[in-house]
């Protein structure tokens, strides 16, 4: 498979899972201190999009989902994020919408609306057209 070298090998999946667990603990601490935006930034940082291991993707989604669901002030959150976070956040919003869970979909749609206003349609197009870096 051409380009497979860019993806993380399966034996590195345990290393990725350990990093996700560490990140999860940090996010829980931030959420307990009502630092929701910092928790979201931490969740989005180092997301493992270049792995084919679904366990890693699912574990990271759980961490990002926890941070997304804690966001109450969407405008404030978007003001605190830099543009580099927009595309990866959009990917996770679509992952959230695919769950079919009503509270998750509701939160993801609210963030999606504000993020699209801020980042434009290009953010959606980049997210949907990037089939290599999936979450």
Curated annotation (Swiss-Prot):
Domain of life: Eukaryota
UniProt keyword list: Actin-binding, Cell projection, Cytoplasm, Cytoskeleton
InterPro entries: ARPC5, ARPC5_sf
GO cellular component: Arp2/3 protein complex; cell projection; cytoplasm
rRNA-binding as UniProt keyword: no
Any GO MF annotation of the entry: actin binding
Pfam families associated with the record: P16-Arc (PF04699)
Compartments, as annotated in UniProt: Cytoplasm, Cytoskeleton; Cell projection
GO biological process assignments: Arp2/3 complex-mediated actin nucleation; regulation of actin filament polymerization
SUPFAM superfamilies hit by this protein: Arp2/3 complex 16 kDa subunit ARPC5 (SSF69103)
Family of the protein in this entry: Belongs to the ARPC5 family.
Record note on quaternary structure: Component of the Arp2/3 complex composed of ARP2, ARP3, ARPC1/p41-ARC, ARPC2/p34-ARC, ARPC3/p21-ARC, ARPC4/p20-ARC and ARPC5/p16-ARC.
Function recorded in the entry: Functions as a component of the Arp2/3 complex which is involved in regulation of actin polymerization and together with an activating nucleation-promoting factor (NPF) mediates the formation of branched actin networks. Arp2/3 complex plays a critical role in the control of cell morphogenesis via the modulation of cell polarity development.
Name of the protein in its database record: Actin-related protein 2/3 complex subunit 5B
Species the sequence originates in: Arabidopsis thaliana
Gene this chain is encoded by: ARPC5B
